[in-house]
Design a protein with these regions (language model features):
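Soluble, acidic/polar mature domains that operate outside membranes
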Residues: 2-524
Length: 524
């Protein structure tokens, strides 16, 4: 049995040796030959004068040696839309469009333009000697697109771009004074074959960052030439250490409290205020808004009376933008004075153009800190349901000092409040803060405001001498029209005004004031 096993091992070893020999002598050469036939060695193409092989793949022909951005001085382009030149400034080493230096050029756009002009990797070299340029849209009479790349060392490269090849994958091209015909990738169609406007980033105003947008000094919105909203940043609140209701002041339509939440939505848009596309660029030597014909084409028949005008300022940099309907659903035309361009802008980018004034205004009428108030004068009448006067109120409070050192004196008694009565007065102060706007007067059908009866007046003199005067006019059983320093377009609940009058009287006379009580709780 052992002998048979040894014989089998010898036979198998011999067979393995024979098969191995056959593989190396017969099969291996055949497989190698077949592999060579399937994957023949590609010899690098013969280069013409001026050409270069792509160093990465070793086979793509470049029409001229690859040029990087750091080597470039300028790129001059002529195509069916006109001409433009992108050049490197000697002053700051940045790239600009010649004659349109104010036009924004993004880093991404510049990178694409630089690659298109500096890397001429060909799809193929069709022929080394073209006999008929007209067949490819490259004859002189065809007026082919053209670009000239100038390097900092003085070297220039000039390329003509002809027809699109049938497959759409590239364009016929030639190098100036060279007979060879090439095909360049169709990626050049988004950089070298477009109008200047396509390459200009449609920025509209100064771009704010996340640290500064909330510090925007001024914001003004006009509609049809009329001021609609005017808000400023109150720098006095900065680093004051005091608790404030808002760091913004509203100057128009009145001295109302700014709705900080909604206004923040506005300011946030300044971090990336740009359009969807640039449609017109003005030159450095002439502002577009000076050309009435051009402006009219984009809906700006009268720049001083534009449908919408947006202005904002941060420090010494200001931005002014006009908006007009574009005729394209969901878009405006916008003209930027800062960049001298007209862009197509999505309505969603600037939704506040269509807001009403109440969107910018907090429901809270009065919002000043008690530490900033000098005097409060309150007068008025409380009437019953029949309009009969039930009580007349006339109270004045002097406020001196701040915080725990504040001293409050009702003029009617001439005696400063004790600590407990100061605490009670602060309940009344909260009642002042809780008189809220309820809605628009224009929806109430009041035709003649001059005939409305004044039922209350609250005059607040601030430490800085400024005055806020609130007047309330009865026009229904439940509502009052309110004005702030003579301006008004809103109404409040009459019961809140009556509670304000009643609590002023109670505070002056040392009676308990509860901000949570309804006026009806006093009279029931």
């Amino acid at each position: 049995m052992v002998k048979k096993q040894k014989i089998m091992l010898i036979v198998m070893a011999s067979l393995f040796a024979v098969l191995t020999l056959l593989y190396f002598l017969v099969f291996a050469p055949l497989l190698e030959k077949k592999n060579e036939e399937a994957n023949p060695t590609v010899e690098p193409p013969t280069l013409l004068d001026g050409e270069q092989l792509d160093k990465d793949d070793g086979k793509t022909i470049l029409m001229f040696p690859y040029a990087e951005r750091k080597e470039m001085k300028s790129i001059e382009v002529i195509n069916q839309y006109g001409s433009f030149t992108c050049y490197r400034s000697d002053e700051d080493d940045n790239f600009y469009f010649k004659g349109y230096e104010q036009a924004p050029l993004s880093a991404d756009t510049l990178a694409s333009l630089v690659v298109s002009a500096g890397y001429t990797g060909t799809v193929e070299r069709v022929t080394e000697k073209c006999e008929d340029w007209g067949m490819y849209g490259l004859a002189e009479e065809d007026e082919p697109a053209y670009y000239k790349l100038t390097l900092l060392n003085g070297t220039t490269h000039e390329i003509y771009i002809g027809d699109l090849i049938k497959s759409g994958g590239g364009y016929y091209a030639r190098y100036k004074d060279r007979d060879a015909l090439y095909v360049l990738s169709n990626t050049i169609q988004s950089t070298l074959l477009v109008p200047l406007e396509t390459l200009v980033t449609p920025y509209l105003g100064m771009l704010m960052d996340q640290q500064s947008y909330a510090l925007t000094d001024e914001f003004i919105l006009l509609k049809n030439g009329e001021t609609f909203v005017y808000i400023t940043y109150d720098k006095s609140t900065q680093n004051s250490g005091e608790s404030v209701f808002s760091v913004y002041d509203m100057h128009y339509p009145g001295q109302y409290t700014v709705n900080d939440s909604k206004y923040t939505e506005v300011l946030l848009t300044f971090c990336n205020l740009q359009g969807a596309a640039t449609v017109k660029v003005g030159g450095t030597d002439k502002m577009l808004h000076e050309d009435e014909e051009v402006m009219a084409q984009y809906g700006f028949e009268n720049v001083s009376n534009a449908p919408y005008e947006l202005y904002y300022r941060y420090g010494d940099q200001d931005s002014l933008i006009l908006f007009a309907p574009s005729g394209i659903e969901g878009y405006y035309f916008a003209y930027s004075y800062l960049y001298n361009l007209i862009a197509l802008v999505e309505e969603a980018t600037v939704p506040y153009l269509e807001w009403n004034t109440k969107d910018f205004i907090s429901d809270q009428l009065f919002h000043e800190s008690i530490n900033d108030v000098y005097d409060i004068e309150i007068s008025g009448v409380i009437t019953n349901g029949a309009g009969v006067v039930e009580k007349e109120i006339d109270e004045t409070f002097n406020l001196r000092g701040t915080g725990n050192d504040i001293e409050i004196t009702p003029v009617s008694t001439g005696k400063p409040f004790s600590t407990d009565l100061i605490r009670n007065f602060k309940q009344f102060y909260m009642v002042m803060l809780l008189v809220n706007i309820q809605g628009y007067m224009k929806t109430e059908g009041v035709e003649d405001y001059s005939k409305l009866e004044e039922i209350a007046c609250v005059k607040v003199t601030m430490d800085d001498g400024s005055i806020l005067e609130y007047k309330y006019y009865s026009y229904s059983a439940r509502r009052c029209y309110v004005t702030v320093n003579g301006e008004g377009e809103f109404y409040v609940n009459k019961k809140d005004v009556f509670k304000l009058l009643c609590d002023a009287n109670r505070a002056a006379n040392g009676l308990t004031v509860d901000r949570n009580m309804e006026y009806s709780d006093y009279v029931d």
